[in-house]
Amino acid sequence: MRSLTAAARRPEVLLLLLCILQPSQPGGVPGAVPGGVPGGVFFPGAGLGGLGVGGLGPGVKPAKPGVGGLVGPGLGAEGSALPGAFPGGFFGAGGGAAGAAAAYKAAAKAGAAGLGVGGIGGVGGLGVSTGAVVPQLGAGVGAGVKPGKVPGVGLPGVYPGGVLPGAGARFPGIGVLPGVPTGAGVKPKAQVGAGAFAGIPGVGPFGGQQPGLPLGYPIKAPKLPAGYGLPYKTGKLPYGFGPGGVAGSAGKAGYPTGTGVGPQAAAAAAKAAAKLGAGGAGVLPGVGVGGPGIPGAPGAIPGIGGIAGVGAPDAAAAAAAAAKAAKFGAAGGLPGVGVPGVGVPGVGVPGVGVPGVGVPGVGVPGVGVPGVGVPGVGVPGVGVPGVGVPGALSPAATAKAAAKAAKFGARGAVGIGGIPTFGLGPGGFPGIGDAAAAPAAAAAKAAKIGAGGVGALGGVVPGAPGAIPGLPGVGGVPGVGIPAAAAAKAAAKAAQFGLGPGVGVAPGVGVVPGVGVVPGVGVAPGIGLGPGGVIGAGVPAAAKSAAKAAAKAQFRAAAGLPAGVPGLGVGAGVPGLGVGAGVPGLGVGAGVPGPGAVPGTLAAAKAAKFGPGGVGALGGVGDLGGAGIPGGVAGVVPAAAAAAKAAAKAAQFGLGGVGGLGVGGLGAVPGAVGLGGVSPAAAAKAAKFGAAGLGGVLGAGQPFPIGGGAGGLGVGGKPPKPFGGALGALGFPGGACLGKSCGRKRK
């Protein structure tokens, strides 16, 4: 009894322990009841059928609950003394029979026995599970069975390939792809219009699986190739296949377009060949014979054009060589009878009768033109390049060699046209044995310069050429005479400095040099001594050019010139304002031009445009006119430059004086404006309308007489139409001929 009582208390202790222990959560439903503590751990003799891995023993039916749902200790058939009475502990997790029943019910829902892993040994019902196990990929469920929810399980054709019967026939050959989840809306799509068999190898327009891509890729069915089904396209089938192996739409035999092969490519080649024309028929295929045909035309077989034959060389090359040879002249004389060699340079050729008998000299070029039989009798041609034609050499090569040889002259021949050094027969090789080449070259060069003929008089004009220009003759030595052009040039240059020193009445000698009796006045200032010479009556035709050059070369204030230089000195008849027949100028005698009155060359240049003036009434008789200081001694008045500037400005208006004839500008001191005649500037202005009249005494403040003074109408001047010469007296503007008011303005 004692042992039974002690044994009966053990469940109480175990219950107490169960109250203290916390239930294990990770165990989950599977294995909660089964998989308790193995038998024999807490209850000796429990064995594998008790709380072991399998819970209930093999083939053992679970005990039914006792009366009232509770089993008293040691009572009933299911007493605690029986091993394995209650799986998973004394009363299970729920306590008593009810708890055990609940545990069994939960275990039944969890699945068949044998799936769970035994929990940790200890109190029954607290076993730890590893969680849900993902079944491995396999053949899945059978046909007609709903596939499970686990990814990859239950779908037909789990692995690529393989057509499964039944439900799997809808997607033959398309299985679940590794790494691609299913059930997320990703479904294989059939090609447009392809029906249910799209994607099946060999069925439908799609060619099936592509090389390098796993089956099922791309996820979306690929699009049709560009231009598929159109009437005009590349001619290639899509992906190289057609539906059912039949050629696709718009397919055609032969090579596809654009590959460079086929009729289109041949047509293009023929079109290009047509531009070049058809090849002529050559003797040998591909080798045309040079002839009248088009040079280079391909033969029967397009290839090498005609080969230049023995025919004449290219005309262009021959012409070029001939043109070059022509620069040095042809050998021999004028084309005639004889051939260079026989009568070539020798008999009547340059040499014997050539430049010699009638050569320049004796019968100077003209009489016996260069040479009796000079180049003319014997002409290069008959026997020269002709009789002894230059071997097999072509004319072009011969001409080229001859042209080059002509530069250095021909080699001397032996005898009269004898056998040349290197040639055979008369004429020999062109250029060898032809002595005319050198003379011809010299003659050609001389021809550029022209032959010197016998001039009319030696030196007058370089000798005129003879009848036929030849070698320079004995004619006058060129250069002895004064050519018109050279003389004109020299005269023009000399005109800048004047002709020769003038002589003047009393060259440059005044009462007191630089002072004069009355500075710049004289008895009748501006009249002068001797006849004043007609203005411009000096040099005739050349006056204009000389005056123009003199005007350009005039020297302003402070520049002295030697005696008699045009512009200031008195010269012989040259147009000017000087006294006597002196050189045009303003000073008397050979005075040195200086800052006195403005040089008269300007007026002369202006007057020269209108021709020489008429002969003045009086030649300008003054007591001491022109014997004043030769305007060149600078000095008593302000500086030469200032005086010249003032004089130039005053000259624009001028002072009354003898119109155009007297000795103008003989001031007291060179550079100062004297009371004498009209200044050159005024004279230049007045010169447009003719020479001024004589008028009264200048510079005394007198009123301008009618027709006199600077503005009056001079001798021979044409009076204005309205009032004749009374304009000045009547007070009309322009009476004094001030500036542009005199007469009609020029446009």
UniProtKB/Swiss-Prot annotation:
Signal peptide per UniProt: 1-26
UniProt keyword Transmembrane present: no
Covalent S-S links between cysteines: 737-742
Modified residues (Hydroxyproline): 188
PTM comment: Elastin is formed through the cross-linking of its soluble precursor tropoelastin. Cross-linking is initiated through the action of lysyl oxidase on exposed lysines to form allysine. Subsequent spontaneous condensation reactions with other allysine or unmodified lysine residues result in various bi-, tri-, and tetrafunctional cross-links. The most abundant cross-links in mature elastin fibers are lysinonorleucine, allysine aldol, desmosine, and isodesmosine.
InterPro entries: Tropoelastin
Keywords: Disulfide bond, Extracellular matrix, Hydroxylation, Repeat, Secreted, Signal
GO cellular component: elastic fiber; extracellular region
Positions carrying Allysine: 105, 109, 252, 271, 275, 324, 327, 400, 404, 407, 445, 448, 489, 493, 544, 548, 552, 606, 609, 645, 649, 685, 688
Modified residues (4-hydroxyproline): 34, 65, 87, 165, 178, 181, 201, 298, 302, 335, 365, 370, 375, 380, 385, 462, 478, 513, 566, 575, 584, 593, 599, 630, 719, 733
Molecular-function GO term, any one: extracellular matrix structural constituent
Superkingdom per UniProt: Eukaryota
Subcellular location(s) of the protein: Secreted, Extracellular space, Extracellular matrix
Function statement: Major structural protein of tissues such as aorta and nuchal ligament, which must expand rapidly and recover completely. Molecular determinant of the late arterial morphogenesis, stabilizing arterial structure by regulating proliferation and organization of vascular smooth muscle.
Family indicated by similarity: Belongs to the elastin family.
Subunit structure and binding partners: The polymeric elastin chains are cross-linked together into an extensible 3D network. Forms a ternary complex with BGN and MFAP2. Interacts with MFAP2 via divalent cations (calcium > magnesium > manganese) in a dose-dependent and saturating manner. Interacts with FBLN5 and FBN1. Forms a ternary complex with FBN1 and FBLN2 or FBLN5. Interacts with MFAP4 in a Ca (2+)-dependent manner; this interaction promotes ELN self-assembly. Interacts with EFEMP2 with moderate affinity.
Name of the protein described by the UniProt record: Elastin
